[in-house]
Amino acid sequence: TEIAKYGLKSFPFAIDGVAVAVNPENAVKSLSKAQLKDIFAGKITNWKQVGGSDEPIIAYQRNTDSGSQNYMIDFMGETPLMDAPTELRPGSMSGLMDVIAPNDGSLGSIGYSVYAYAADMYGTGDNIKFIKVDGAAPTKETIISGEYPLSSYNYAIFRADEPEEGAVRRLAEWMTSYDGQLAAAKAGYATVEDIGFDYEE
């Protein structure tokens, strides 16, 4: 594998998705993957083009060193993300949620964040609304089943020559232990235990 070629070892320890969030007053409830790509490519610029009100779309992105930004780049595939000005790149996940939450001028906003953070750590309530993608809402269940299309594994990656009794190996073993998986679940992540992942395969 590509990882092994560089002398590294990897394994999944949790599963998460990227949730697409809009202002709760936005009438649009679902987007297709193609529509979502066109929005963040700058091809769809008004909500009326996807069944919403006549409101310009304000598409927020994350910083280039953000995990959710890198996931969105992967999701876009050969379709490049449009260049977003600095003011449309909040520096934190909470900052992204804040600009989407109800305030003057936020009705047309759309953005994305790690599901575990947006749903369990930041909270939704009346502040934001998750958009369905291809008819599937982001939940732990749909992320685990793969029904929600913007889901992926989180991997631990370390050098393959790390000592067996070293701190790195011990941490890796803990991440896949009962306590480690419980910690991941409490943080809002779906765990590899949920799908019966076999580390011996």
Feature map (PLM): residue ranges:
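Exported/periplasmic ABC-transporter solute-binding proteins
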Residues: 1-201
